[in-house]
């Protein structure tokens, strides 16, 4: 990622059609037993919240903003301001708002956030068709993208266990 940043000056915008930065989050409930997930229309899967940086270099801010926009929660806070994980995620070509977007890479930065499970949630109709709290031990069952499930989500769950953020679920 560092080499890519040093090579291109537009990695924070979608103008870089080969790859650009995105920020995602695992929004945990206060008991740290569930993650707030969305049913993503493009990926056709339950997924974490997140989005493009669109020129903003404060990726924690982007992750928090996207979590609020995509789920309707009003209050979310970082468990830590540190980046929790980095991922290079291939995005296959797809149609978005009537326009074809070619295959590209998301240079994805992941943060751990916390929100109140009792806060009202709602769908962001242009991006997702569902929002719900998913028990951590069920995440790998509800996610239908094999690579993300096995290489990203499983890794994050194991890291959270190792780091003592969650218990053995």
Predicted regions span which residues?
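Short connector loops at helix/strand junctions that flank enzyme active sites
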Residues: 18-23, 30, 41-43, 48, ...
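Unchanged
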Residues: 54-147
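Short glycine-rich loop/turn motifs
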Residues: 22-24, 33-35, 128
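Glycine-rich active-site/cofactor-binding loop and its immediate structural neighborhood
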Residues: 28-30, 35-65
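Residue-level signal for pocket-adjacent positions within structured domains
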Residues: 7, 16, 41, 48, ...
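Short histidine-centered beta-strand/loop micro-motifs
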Residues: 14-16, 36-38, 51, 122-124
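Acidic, metal-coordinating catalytic segment for phosphate/diphosphate chemistry
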Residues: 1-24, 168-169
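Charged phosphate-binding loop/patch that engages nucleotide di/tri-phosphates or the phosphate backbone
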Residues: 144-169
């Amino acid at each position: 990622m560092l080499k890519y940043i040093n090579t291109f000056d537009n990695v924070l915008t979608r103008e870089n059609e080969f790859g650009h930065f995105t920020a995602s989050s695992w929004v945990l409930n206060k008991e740290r037993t569930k993650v707030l997930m969305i049913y993503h229309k493009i990926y056709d899967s339950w997924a974490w919240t997140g989005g493009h940086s669109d020129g903003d270099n404060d990726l924690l801010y982007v992750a928090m903003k996207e979590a609020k926009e995509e789920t309707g929660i009003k209050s979310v806070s970082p468990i830590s301001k540190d980046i929790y994980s980095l991922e290079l995620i291939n995005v296959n070509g797809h149609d978005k708002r009537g326009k074809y977007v070619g295959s590209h890479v998301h240079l994805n930065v992941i943060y751990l956030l916390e929100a109140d499970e009792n806060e009202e949630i709602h769908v962001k109709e242009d991006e997702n068709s569902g929002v719900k709290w998913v028990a951590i031990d069920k995440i790998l069952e509800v996610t239908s993208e094999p690579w993300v499930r096995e290489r990203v989500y499983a890794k994050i769950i194991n890291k959270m266990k190792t780091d003592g953020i969650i218990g053995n679920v």
